[in-house]
A protein has these predicted regions:
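N-terminal glycine-rich beta->alpha transition that marks the start or flank
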Residues: 11-14, 19-68
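A glycine-/small-residue-rich N-terminal strand-loop-strand element
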Residues: 68-91
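Short helix-loop-beta connector
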Residues: 82, 109-112, 134-140
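Mid-domain Rossmann-like dinucleotide-binding core that forms the NAD(H)/NADP(H) cofactor-binding site
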Residues: 119-188
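Glycine-rich phosphate-binding loop and adjacent beta-alpha segment
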Residues: 178, 209-269, 276, 299-300
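Short amphipathic alpha-helix with an adjacent loop that forms part of the alpha/beta core around
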Residues: 191-201
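C-terminal capping/lid region of NAD(P)-dependent oxidoreductase domains
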Residues: 267-269, 283-300
Length: 300
């Protein structure tokens, strides 16, 4: 089968389409014929070697975590799906014609494969960090970097929970944030004053999604380091803020998002799709930032 791999750490240009053996579902897993795969920041961070802790890449590696497709192989112990079912979920090396998923949920009939492929990592991350930061209905949440994949999930889920959201994004993505239900503002110098103008009663909690060095400003706005949480700035703890990195209940988060979609209460827009042969361009676009919604790789 065809799959996207890299044999060395580096820029997006190290990605290649290669012929590899098909994977097979093990115990508690399913294999899907991939229709689409979501692009996440963690994909290019792994490819660039940021997560390798200085160790060399021992062998060629696939890329991609999120995927949507049709089940064509069911592992031992799996009883909630059958061959032919449409699902979306998380696995490894999902930029490929076939991929093995370790966590999945049924794809709602009205949700396209491209849209579904954009759900897994963002919705798991969004629900996890909203729970961890402890923001409650009636409170105000500031989201730094609100227009990307995770931010695009955080905003509507928070709004469904009765939380007011102020989000930062570039000028061109301000209307997009409004469409999600957030009050937009720009990032950069003067952030504290701009947010205070928008939230005279203060900000109750803040999420740093972009990792753009704003932890001190977020702490100033919340008045309490423990009410600031980052998924992108690993130095946040030096300021007393918290960092969240580990997935906890991917299936539960995906099921919640699927149910909200079915009820007409949640969408995660796809900004752009790329064919498998342009996976390098997809990751480069993600790495450049300023994306409004999700980037997705499609598989013929």
């Amino acid at each position: 089968m065809q799959a996207v791999q890299f044999a060395e750490y580096g820029s997006p240009q190290v990605l290649r389409i290669v012929e590899v053996e098909e994977p097979h579902a093990g115990e508690g897993q399913v294999r899907i014929a991939v229709r689409a795969a979501g692009v996440n920041a963690i994909d290019w961070k792994i490819r660039a070697g940021y997560m390798g802790r200085g160790r060399p890449l021992g062998q060629p590696s696939g890329t991609g975590i999120d995927a949507a497709g049709v089940v064509d192989e069911v592992g031992e112990g799996v009883s909630d799906v059958a061959v032919g079912d449409a699902v979306f979920g998380t696995g490894r090396a999902t930029f490929a014609e076939y991929a093995v998923l370790s966590s999945w949920v049924a794809k709602p009939s009205g949700l396209s494969f491209e849209e579904a492929a954009g759900y897994p990592v963002p919705v798991e991350t969004a629900t996890r960090i909203l729970d961890e930061v402890g923001v409650q209905p009636g409170e105000t949440l500031l989201v730094s970097g609100a227009s990307g994949g995770v931010g695009s999930a955080v905003v509507p889920i928070a709004r469904q929970r009765g939380i007011s959201v102020i989000g930062t994004a570039s000028e061109r993505n301000q209307d997009y944030l409004r469409s999600l239900g957030a009050t937009p503002t720009t990032y950069g110098d003067g952030l504290v004053d701009r947010v205070r103008d928008l939230a005279p009663n203060g900000v109750d909690a803040a999420l740093d999604i972009a990792g753009s060095g704003v932890i001190p400003e977020l702490i100033e706005l919340t008045g309490e380091p423990s009410r600031v949480l980052s998924i992108a700035d690993f130095g946040a703890s030096e300021h007393g803020a918290r960092v969240s990195t580990s997935s906890r209940n991917a299936a539960g988060a995906m099921a919640e998002a699927a149910q909200l979609f079915t009820e007409g209460a949640f969408t995660l827009p796809v900004e752009r799709t790329f064919p498998l042969e342009k996976a390098a361009e997809a990751q480069a676009t993600s790495e450049a930032g300023h994306v409004a919604g999700r980037l997705v790789v499609t598989v013929p």
